[in-house]
Structure formats: C-alpha cells, structure tokens
C-alpha cells in the first residue's frame, strides 16, 4: 500500500530526520510535544506571507533552538531585525526557556513540496482554476530539476455539489523505494464552498543515509599506477613459464602448386587414408538397333 503511507514517516532514520529533536521522560513527553504543536501553529499564522517550508525545534539543556526554513528570510527578520526580536520574546514566553531563532533560506522554493502546496491553495482561494494552478506548479518543478512530481486536490473542486479527487503526475514518483528522496507536503484552501485539500509529492533523486552521499572515488592515472610484477608460485617461478610454445601447422597459400612428388594426378591434400572417395557417376547405356540384334542387316 505505497500510496497510503506517509512518505516522511516511512523514511524516518533512513533518509529523513525528525522535525523535533529532543529527549524527555514519560512524564514530560506529552507536554513538550503539545508545546511544539502550539509553536508551529503560532509561526504558521504569524509568518503566513513569509513562505515558511518547515520548522525545526531542538531542546538542548534548559534552552530551545528553533530553525525556520523560509523562501523569504527578509520578511521573517523584518526591518533592522525588529520582527525576529519580537518573535524571540514571544516564543520564550510560550516555552518558558531562552529561545534562539535561526533563519535558513530555501534556495529553490519551486521544488519544495510544502511551498508548492501553499502556492496552489493561495491560488484556489483567489478563484483560479485548480487544473491551471496544478499544471503550472508541475511545469515549474520539472524545469528546476525535479525528477518527478505528483499533485492531488480533494474537495468541492470548482464549487461542484459532490466532492471528488483529482491528481496529476509528471515524471516518476517511487513511493516504495526507501532510498528515494521524496519531499511531501500538504495544505488546505479555505474557500466559500468549503475546504479543499492539496497534497504534493516531489521526487528529487536517490540518496544514501540522511542526505549524505559517499564521496566519488577518482580514477588513478597511468602514471600513478604501479607496474605489475611477475606472479610467482611456491617454487619461485611463474607457473607455465618453462612450457614450450605450441606449434601451429601452416597451410600453403591459395593458388600454390600442391601436386605430390610421386607424379600422381591427385593433389597432395587428397592423398592418404583420410582422403574422400570420388563420387560415382552413372552413365546411361544406349540400346542397339533391333535390326542389328537379329542379324538381318548382314
């Protein structure tokens, strides 16, 4: 059931990492997890126009470090860093510990699944045709290096009475391959007809480990290669070194005189016990005239 499972949860600890990285005992785990959910909801509402892809929350000893991945870091920082300072104070008040906020820029927002889904939902809320929005997003993703993309929209598309689901795919999106780097994102559009959900899968290629590929091994040049010496066995000599070279019988060239020296009319190749026998020719006998057979002609 590769279509049903969550691509990120399926690849955790293989090619994906957790969005919240901290340890807690059984008593504090639920409370800290609820705090993370509230922080993400707050940042989603606060930075709605900043194109936020994901939020990474880390909790070192009695501190918190929040990394915001955004395609528009200038909107998050604000004029002279005022917005980010206000953000730090609000997050520290919610978590109750000192908070450090880092901003990471998303270089290619066109191939980020979350940003693609948010872009489509914004267009749907502006009453743009969903097929046009989906196909435009797919073209931009394939143009910027994605190997495959799949977009699915569900709900009352174009305001119809019965909700349905439509999806489009371009390229290949291997959902069962664990080493495949599949970026998955969802978003919801609040329309006058109801909620329209958008899911996006983006295939960016294969990866090993947590986005760590082994270094390519360069081939050595001829000058760097060491000359290979003779291989020796237990007796100290190369096996087969004292073996004489095989003798190859040479055949006479085509058109040469191959007549035998004894004067026979057969060629030298045809003489001997193994020579093929000549084919037997059948001669048709001509019958004598009847008069000559009876003796009446004399």
Swiss-Prot record:
Family designation: Belongs to the universal ribosomal protein uS3 family.
- Per the record, the domain of life is Bacteria
HAMAP family on file: Ribosomal_uS3_B (MF_01309_B)
Q: Which taxonomic lineage does the organism of this UniProt entry have? A: Bacteria, Pseudomonadati, Pseudomonadota, Betaproteobacteria, Burkholderiales
Query: For bias kind Basic and acidic residues, which ranges apply?
Result: 219-245
State the function annotated in the UniProt record.
Binds the lower part of the 30S subunit head. Binds mRNA in the 70S ribosome, positioning it for translation.
Q: Where is the composition biased (Low complexity)?
A: 277-298
Question: Residues in domain KH type-2?
Answer: 39-107
Gene transcribed to yield this protein: rpsC
Indicate whether Ribonucleoprotein appears among the record's keywords.
yes
Q: Single Gene Ontology BP term?
A: translation
Which SUPFAM superfamilies has this protein been placed in?
Prokaryotic type KH domain (KH-domain type II), Ribosomal protein S3 C-terminal domain
Gene Ontology terms: cellular component:
cytosolic small ribosomal subunit
**Sequence segments annotated as region (Disordered):** 214-298
Q: Which GO terms describe its molecular function?
A: mRNA binding; rRNA binding; structural constituent of ribosome
State whether it acts alone or in a complex, and with which partners, per the record. Part of the 30S ribosomal subunit. Forms a tight complex with proteins S10 and S14.
Disulphide-bonded residues:
none
Supply the alphabetized keyword list. Answer: Ribonucleoprotein, Ribosomal protein, RNA-binding, rRNA-binding
Protein name stated in the entry: Small ribosomal subunit protein uS3
């Amino acid at each position: 059931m590769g279509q049903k499972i969550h691509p990120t949860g399926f690849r955790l600890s293989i090619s994906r990492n957790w969005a919240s990285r901290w340890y807690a005992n059984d008593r504090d785990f639920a409370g800290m997890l609820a705090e993370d959910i509230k922080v993400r909801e707050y940042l989603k509402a606060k930075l709605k126009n900043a194109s936020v892809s994901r939020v990474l929350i880390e909790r070192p000893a009695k501190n918190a470090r929040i990394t915001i991945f955004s395609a528009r870091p200038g909107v998050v920082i604000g004029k002279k860093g005022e917005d980010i300072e206000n953000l730090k104070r609000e997050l520290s008040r919610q978590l109750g510990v000192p908070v450090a906020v880092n901003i990471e820029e998303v270089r290619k927002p066109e191939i980020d699944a979350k940003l693609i889904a948010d872009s489509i939902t914004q267009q749907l809320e502006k009453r743009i045709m969903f097929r046009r929005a989906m196909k435009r997003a797919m073209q931009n993703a394939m143009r910027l290096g994605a190997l495959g993309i799949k977009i699915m929209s569900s709900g009352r598309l174009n305001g119809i009475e019965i909700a349905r689901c439509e999806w489009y795919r371009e390229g290949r999106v291997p959902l069962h391959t664990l080493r495949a780097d599949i970026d998955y994102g969802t978003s919801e559009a609040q329309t006058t007809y109801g909620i329209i959900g958008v899911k996006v899968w983006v295939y960016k290629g294969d990866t090993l480990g947590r986005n760590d590929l082994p270094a390519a091994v360069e081939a050595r040049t001829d000058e760097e290669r060491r000359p290979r010496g003779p291989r020796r066995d237990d007796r100290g000599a190369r096996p087969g070194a004292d073996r004489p070279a095989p003798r190859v019988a040479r055949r006479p060239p085509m058109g040469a005189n191959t007549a035998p020296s004894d004067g026979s009319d057969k060629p030298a190749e045809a003489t001997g016990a193994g020579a093929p026998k000549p084919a037997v020719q059948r001669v048709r006998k001509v019958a004598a005239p009847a008069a000559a057979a009876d003796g009446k002609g004399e």
